Amino acid sequence: SKDNQKNYIPLIVPFAT
């Protein structure tokens, strides 16, 4: 559960910028 939230954060960070 906690790993899933941290896994999706780095994925949306590079593309969101």
Curated annotation (Swiss-Prot):
Keywords: Glycoprotein. Chorionic epithelium (trophectoderm) and placental cotyledons. Glycosylated. On the 2D-gel the determined pI of this protein is: 7.4, its MW is: 45 kDa. This is Unknown placental glycoprotein 45J2. It comes from Bison bonasus.
